[in-house]
Design a protein with these regions (language model features):
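Non-catalytic beta/alpha edge segments that cap or flank active sites
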Residues: 2-157
Length: 157
């Protein structure tokens, strides 16, 4: 779990904490949880290291997907993707529209597959992370979800 923020600390990172707890409750192991500033190269370096680690199968990022001057998660991570998972951003924005209306057009949530690791990039709000988890991620990271899920494409499976 990687929080992208210039202001969050371990104590104030409610989105990262939510994702860590949700993953644990669903039976997943957490290899690492970090906070990185909104910097393309620092973000790319951490995620590249995790992609290269055979123990890391899924990366969830929160933050840096908006339009402020320093939001850079899409620019940092999209070049690392071997394949994009366009449906994640599409479904996330559709779910978000029911909650925040037209403001959802400002979401640049995205996902991709890199070296057998799936990477999901969500906005920084805890509500957005909850929407993504409950509406997409919980099922797609569950090997028993039918008709399909991402477990079969992960490096370790």
């Amino acid at each position: 779990v990687l929080t992208v923020s210039d202001t969050r600390t371990q104590q104030t990172d409610t989105s990262g904490a939510f994702l860590e707890e949700a993953l644990r409750e669903a039976g997943h192991e957490i290899a690492d949880r970090q906070i990185v500033i909104d910097d393309v190269y620092q973000l790319r370096a951490i995620v590249s290291q995790w992609i290269a680690d055979p123990e890391v199968e899924v990366i969830l990022t929160t933050g840096g997907t908006g339009f402020s001057g320093r939001d850079s998660t899409p620019e940092a991570l999209a070049p690392l993707f071997d394949k994009t998972i366009d449906g994640f951003g599409e479904v996330f924005r559709a779910l978000s529209h029911t909650e925040i209306g037209s403001s959802t057009v400002q979401s640049r949530a995205l996902a991709g597959l890199a070296n057998g690791t799936v990477i999901f990039c969500m906005p920084g709000s805890t509500g957005a992370c909850r929407t993504a988890w409950e509406g997409v991620l919980r099922d797609q990271l569950d090997s028993e979800h039918k008709p399909c899920n991402f477990v079969g494409v992960l490096r370790g499976h």
